[in-house]
């Protein structure tokens, strides 16, 4: 499916490193020579695949120029999906060998909201239904890609994030 719609990726942006977000990043990076941007767990994951040189460990609130895009990684938190008490598989990826990478080994790592600006348009992607309220400084967003898994476990998630971003369009993901 990806090959049909995205013939070549130049960059991969990881908001966190649970398997459902990061599993295919090394394969796509290897296939296309793409650079993977994310936290320290993303860098560790790429290193396990022998792709350390294709990983960028991002800095909070720094803007990266990636082709025509300006990309900013905004510190965030993951929703507490386990009975509303804890983040599943929290912590960093610590495997030293690829054969140890079970789904549970894909620990959350650092969590980011991702702000993109291109050609006068802005997009904000929140892959997990929680946030650090004071970290959201981008407003008047054109498109908000709103991750909602776990929103029931986060106090007033939608009521907190929507006024901060003030998006024109919301896409539920």
Model-inferred region functions:
Residues 10, 129-173:
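Cap/insert and terminal regions of metallo-dependent hydrolase folds
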């Amino acid at each position: 499916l990806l090959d049909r719609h995205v013939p070549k990726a130049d960059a991969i942006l990881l908001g966190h490193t649970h398997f459902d977000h990061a599993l295919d990043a090394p394969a796509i990076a290897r296939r296309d020579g793409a650079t993977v941007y994310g936290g320290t767990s993303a860098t560790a994951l790429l290193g396990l695949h022998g792709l350390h040189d294709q990983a960028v460990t991002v800095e909070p609130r720094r803007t990266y120029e990636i082709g025509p895009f300006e990309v900013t990684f905004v510190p965030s938190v993951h929703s507490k999906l386990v009975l509303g008490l804890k983040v599943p598989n929290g912590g960093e990826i610590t495997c030293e060998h690829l054969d140890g990478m079970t789904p549970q080994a894909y620990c959350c790592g650092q969590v980011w909201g991702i702000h993109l600006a291109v050609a006068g348009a802005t997009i904000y992607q929140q892959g997990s239904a929680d946030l650090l309220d004071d970290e959201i400084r981008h407003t008047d967003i054109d498109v908000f890609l709103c991750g909602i898994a776990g929103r029931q476990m986060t106090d007033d998630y939608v009521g907190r994030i929507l006024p901060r971003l003030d998006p024109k369009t919301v896409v539920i993901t």
